[in-house]
């Protein structure tokens, strides 16, 4: 028989729990996972809370998990997460679908003036005036059996969250920002956000200034690594580190013996892996220069006036404080550089609510019709 605030390890209890959940309009959901040694996160626990009950579901106990997948897909029940992105990634990988509908309290908190990427601890402190016991924060959730304290810690994440939801919802309604939160949350439900195209994997590798030919080799080496790591379910750097991959692209060895002499090549790299790397380099060399990747980011350091960028940062800080919105939610440094590089393009900051709280000011500043002054130790804007 299902008892609240316990861990579920058998199918009968899971079905009883499911029958309680489907009567709810709102469920708080959280997960515990480990990603140290795998490409995909290893799901260790799912915590779910309704208004007056909660449980942790153990996916490692051989449960038939379909009732949980059905709950997550049930569009009549709102699923409330905090910092939902990683949870969604797990569920998408396991089921092929994203939970619907969802509400992310971290996104909502950023619209309430609580700062950038509000942590769960801060959220609980602000809304419930409680402190979280961090004793089990770094638990190895793959270990079994879990202790009573571990289970209670995991479940408390959702029992707090289900109480926070109506409070933060009221605050968002009072601020008349429901549509803003909804639009930002919708971004999380785009499957493309979680699917990495192997041919774009190279873009996340931090490298020093290089030429397009080397980038071409890096593009296909990174693509090969991405595909292999997915197949083997191992971290990228477990196969080959980023810096080593960049060195291979730069040196372009055509023989296995020369490849193995490159610093950082692991002895664990099999002969077959070495052969595939050499073959990837050979195939990469067949592309014409007009097919090589473009170095789109060179303008950032060379052609952007630093003073102009700092002015936009100051304006962003001002607009953030004035609106009570997190700076990161409005724009980041990359956005500001892009605006300075192509000011007439319809950038994200010139659309919707961002335009209202920030974009309009940016246009006025770029048109030379906005100035800064200081009055009583506070920044003041002057429009011409």
Residue ranges with predicted function:
Residues 47, 52-67, 71-162, 169, ...:
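Active-site-proximal helix-loop-helix substrate-binding element of RNase H-like nuclease domains
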Residues 33-40:
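Single-stranded nucleic-acid-binding OB-fold domains
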Residues 148, 168-384:
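Accessory DNA-binding and partner-docking regions appended to nucleic-acid-acting proteins
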Residues 1-27, 31:
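N-terminal accessory regions of nucleic-acid-interacting proteins
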Residues 28, 37, 45-48:
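Non-catalytic, usually N-terminal nucleic-acid engagement modules in DNA/RNA processing proteins
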């Amino acid at each position: 028989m299902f008892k609240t605030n316990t861990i579920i390890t058998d199918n009968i209890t899971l079905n009883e729990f499911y029958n309680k959940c489907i009567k709810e309009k709102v469920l708080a959901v959280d997960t515990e996972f480990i990603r140290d040694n795998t490409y995909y996160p290893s799901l260790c626990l799912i915590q779910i809370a309704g208004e007056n009950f909660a449980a942790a579901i153990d996916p490692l106990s051989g449960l038939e998990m379909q009732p949980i997948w059905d709950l997550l897909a049930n569009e009549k029940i709102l699923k409330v997460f905090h910092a939902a992105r990683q949870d969604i990634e797990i569920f998408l990988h396991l089921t092929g679908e994203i939970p619907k509908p969802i509400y992310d309290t971290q996104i909502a908190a950023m619209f309430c003036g609580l700062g950038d990427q509000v942590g769960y601890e801060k959220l609980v402190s602000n809304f419930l005036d409680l402190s979280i016991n961090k004793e089990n924060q770094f638990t190895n959730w793959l270990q079994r059996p879990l202790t009573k304290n571990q289970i209670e810690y995991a479940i408390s994440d959702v029992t707090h969250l289900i109480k926070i939801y109506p409070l933060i919802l009221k605050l968002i309604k009072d601020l008349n920002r429901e549509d803003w939160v909804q639009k930002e949350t919708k971004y999380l439900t785009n499957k493309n956000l979680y699917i990495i195209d192997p041919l774009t994997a190279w873009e996340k590798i931090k490298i020093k200034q290089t030429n397009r030919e080397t980038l071409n080799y890096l593009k296909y080496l990174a693509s090969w690594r991405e595909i292999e790591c997915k197949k083997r379910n191992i971290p990228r750097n477990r196969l080959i580190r980023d810096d080593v991959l960049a060195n291979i692209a730069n040196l372009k060895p055509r023989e296995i013996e020369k490849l193995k002499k490159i610093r950082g090549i692991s002895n664990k790299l099999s002969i077959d892996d070495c052969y595939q790397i050499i073959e990837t380099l050979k195939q990469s060399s067949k592309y014409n220069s007009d097919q090589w990747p473009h170095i789109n980011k060179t303008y950032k350091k060379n052609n952007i006036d630093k003073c102009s960028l700092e002015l936009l940062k100051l304006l962003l800080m001002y607009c953030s404080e004035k609106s009570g919105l997190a700076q990161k939610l409005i724009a980041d440094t990359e956005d500001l550089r892009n605006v300075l590089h192509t000011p007439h393009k319809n950038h994200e900051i010139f659309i919707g609510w961002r335009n209202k709280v920030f974009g309009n000011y940016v246009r006025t500043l770029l048109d030379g019709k906005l100035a800064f002054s200081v009055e009583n130790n506070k920044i003041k804007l002057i429009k011409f």
